Amino acid sequence: MDRISNLSDDLLLKIVSSLPTKDVVVTMLLSKRWKFLWMMVPKLRFDDEFELEPSYYGRFLKYVDKSMVLNRAQVLETVKFNVGPCCSSEDIATWIRIGMVRNMRELEISHCEGYFREHRSIKLPKSLYTYEKLEVLKLASTVVLNVPIDVCFPSLKSLHLVCVEYKTKKSHRRLLSGCPVLEELVLDKSYNSFHVRSFYVEIPTLQSLSILDTSGELYGDFTFVVNAPALKYFNFVDFYGDLCLRDNMPEVVDVNIKVIYRNPKKLLGPLKSVKRLSLCLSPSTTLHNHMEFYQLVHLELCGDALMWWDLLTWMLQSSPKLQVLKIYECKCEEHDYLDDPIEEHWEEPSSVPQCLLFHLNIFEWKYYNAGDEEKKVVAYILKNARQLKTATFSAASYLYPKEERSRELNELVYMARASSSCQLLLD
């Protein structure tokens, strides 16, 4: 305790700021010096632990009120609320207004109403929508967005909308248009987006975009239109949504896409500058003319998707500078809902792809099943990848006994390798 007391106030504040606010308050019992130090903490985190009993929630309410009113930090860097069904819009509005007076920079609200109570969503106060100092806003679950026409977040750089409710069809578009310097957007349409079937993300300053469907809604028919020319990171995981990328994205570097899509060429066209690409993609059309991903050096493909053989060949032909190729199985349940697949056969490219001849140096296959077509792919890559340094294979343990897995993997040792320095790693 004496050693801690010798630390500077600034360092102590950094330490206690990482704790839940209820634990921070307890520190005032440690010494006279700490009695008022907790009031200067710039990060406040409140969690009612999904309290269902109104009387206990009343205590939590008073505790939050007191903690926020007594706080003396010049700037509240973070204010976070994780609340359950007893919390009301009025409670949240009061706390938000106090936070705005205290120059709040980041606001996070997660509200879970509970399945056994009447629907009680959280509505945000209108004054928040024109708060000029907010830099980060994260909203989750049953939070309603009723966005006014005059919405303006001139400082907002990060926005997370996870399973929120949109009051009108215009709410999301109006909100995004009021964020002129937004750099990061996370959008999860699960459960509560029934008013909105078409999402428009048209933000010239956006650098990072994640569009998710964590619930895996099969009744989909959602359309996402993205126009973000400054985008560098793009993550799209929605097997039943439709994605339209407008114009080229010359700055994009890292892309992860999981979707059932009819035309991969149309989907990936605006992403030609990508350097790292992860695909769980089920094309429903035959891929012919290849594209040119001149900067692509790292590719990950899901070997669990329908017609992935064609996609593999197409990507090898389209990626002349590819250095890393990883094949995996994502075990997505969504693949179970596809029509019965036709029997697939892998066909070798008409000519050896440039990436195999000159650049590929890492090849990895996770959950290798040692099927006939898989063996053809492995044999072809090992036979033609002249610069290959490592080839790593791990067997699908859920399908075969250990002895059989070892036997299948050991067969790879006898396959011809174009690279004399290639190291074969078997797991």
Swiss-Prot record:
Database matches in CDD domains: F-box_AtFBL13-like
Pfam families xrefs: F-box (PF00646), FBD (PF08387), LRR_At5g56370 (PF24758)
Gene3D superfamilies to which the protein is assigned, alphabetical: Ribonuclease Inhibitor
InterPro entries: F-box-like_dom_sf, F-box_AtFBL13-like, F-box_dom, FBD, FBL13/AtMIF1-like, LRR_dom_sf, LRR_FXL15/At3g58940/PEG3-like
Domain of life: Eukaryota
Alphabetized SMART domains for the sequence: FBD (SM00579)
Domain spans labelled F-box: 1-53
Residue ranges crossing the lipid bilayer per the database entry: none
Residue ranges occupied by any FBD domain in the UniProt entry: 345-395
Protein name: Putative FBD-associated F-box protein At3g50710
